[in-house]
Amino acid sequence: AVFIQAQEAEDEEDESIFELSPFSIQEDESIGYQALSTLAGTRIKTALRDTGAAISVITPEFLEDIGAVDAASVLSYSLNTEVSGEQGNFAGGVETGDDRSNPAVNGQRVRGISPASLTRGYFLTDIPFDSYNTTRITINRGPNSLLFGVANPGGVINNQVKLATLGDNFGSVKFRFGERGGNRQELDVNGIIIPGRL
């Protein structure tokens, strides 16, 4: 038994150790207003130029520049979308047969057909999105997937929410004032709580 243990120890020493190169995943690949990749259409990270679907990606820079804070203000600037309400570009509603009556959810049409399915991280939601917690918005006009998926005939509007960034301290404060007494305040803070851990 001693001979076998000694032989195993020699075999372990003979094995060379391979050190792998660091592997990193970047959250967002965009340059200004131009997004380079998406999960929409295939559920696999794909370059936008290689997708066979009509997809628009609204980047954080574009959201900031147009002053968008909700779906209505984003869809007013998007391709092949219509939104009802004060900032809208169509009158009337679309009867979808469901019980939802929230205009922030139902007051939009994509491709002139019907409201798009709203998703957060590509999971269905009825929660309207807001710019304070949004990193990018992907509008997929038409069927949502290559093989399967959840979508209305109009398509999918996906909201990608902000996530905590480990190992980084940053923050921002925004104040916005508008006509007729409108105002909005935002506070966004990311900080290290326990150095090296959280």
Model feature map: region roles:
Residues 133-135, 141, 145-198:
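Outer-membrane beta-barrel translocator/receptor signature
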Residues 15-22, 50-53, 58, 103-105, ...:
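Extracytoplasmic
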Residues 37-48, 52-56, 66, 70-128, ...:
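Extracytoplasmic beta-strand/coil segments of soluble accessory domains associated
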Residues 55, 63, 74-75, 137-142, ...:
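Non-catalytic regulatory/gating segments with a bias toward low-complexity or hydrophobic composition
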Residues 22-29, 110-114, 141, 161-163:
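Flexible glycine-/small-residue-rich
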Residues 30-36, 118-119, 181-182:
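Short, solvent-exposed loop/turn elements at domain surfaces
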Residues 6-64:
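Short, acidic, small-residue-rich periplasmic hinge/interaction motif at the N-terminus
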Residues 1-5:
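C-terminal segment of classical bacterial N-terminal signal peptides
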